[in-house]
Design a protein with these regions (language model features):
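Short alpha-helix boundary/capping elements
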Residues: 34-42, 81, 119, 134, ...
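C-terminal accessory module of base-excision DNA glycosylases/AP lyases that mediates lesion recognition
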Residues: 1-16, 70, 74-77, 89-192
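Alpha-helical ds-nucleic-acid-binding substructure associated with the helix-hairpin-helix region
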Residues: 38-102, 106
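Structure-specific DNA junction-binding interface
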Residues: 1-65
Length: 192
């Protein structure tokens, strides 16, 4: 993955910073709300436009057409100071995060990871990989983290990215195993 140009994302996963302040907390929460159900490449520019609108005193609705997510985004921004203070005071961060608007049982792991927590997000790719190994996402990533010395968050990032970019087909892996699902030559050729 490093040779294919993904060293920066591995380095990021190893050193994810905790939120510096309420605005940083809100921005990360808003990104996760937007990213839910979207590819990261699609979500990033939408999130950037929404943040510009919010900082200008406008609603995210000026930049994003999803009515439910607009309400959640605007609320997170409006209540960022209170939400950040509550997050900082909470010992069970995952339990707190699920109370945020549009953050559910899976996205809370994505958000806590982006807030510096050492977690894996049990999304569709990760769950397929785990099922093949007769385990769950969290146990799979913890085991691989112990074996490699990387953080759980990094293992999650590397495996998810491998699936998202086509290096590893999680659907085929679940059914047929590693040899059928792993495509390094095709992956490296597509990145030339």
């Amino acid at each position: 993955m490093r040779e294919a140009g993904y060293g920066a994302i591995i380095d990021w996963s190893e050193t994810i910073a905790k939120p510096a302040d309420a605005e940083d907390f809100a921005e990360k929460a808003i990104f996760v709300v937007i990213a839910s159900g979207f590819k990261s490449a699609t979500a990033k520019p939408i999130a950037e436009r929404c943040m510009l609108a919010l900082r200008a005193g406008l609603s995210s609705a000026t930049e994003f057409g999803h009515p439910g997510k607009q309400v959640a985004i605007d609320r997170i921004w409006a209540e960022r100071e209170e939400m950040f203070a509550a997050y900082e005071a909470e010992t069970d961060k995952l339990r707190f995060l699920i109370s945020l608007p549009w953050v559910g049982p899976v996205t809370r792991f994505h958000l806590e990871k982006n807030l510096g927590g050492d977690h894996a997000k049990p999304d569709v790719h990760m769950e397929r990989l785990a099922r093949r190994d007769k385990t769950d996402t969290h146990k799979l990533c913890r085991r691989l983290a112990r074996e490699t010395g990387y953080r759980v968050a990094t293992i999650d990032t590397v495996l998810w990215r491998a699936c998202a970019e086509g290096l590893l087909n999680s659907k085929i892996y679940e059914k047929k195993g590693w040899k059928a699902a792993f495509h390094p030559k095709r992956f490296l050729a597509s990145n030339d």
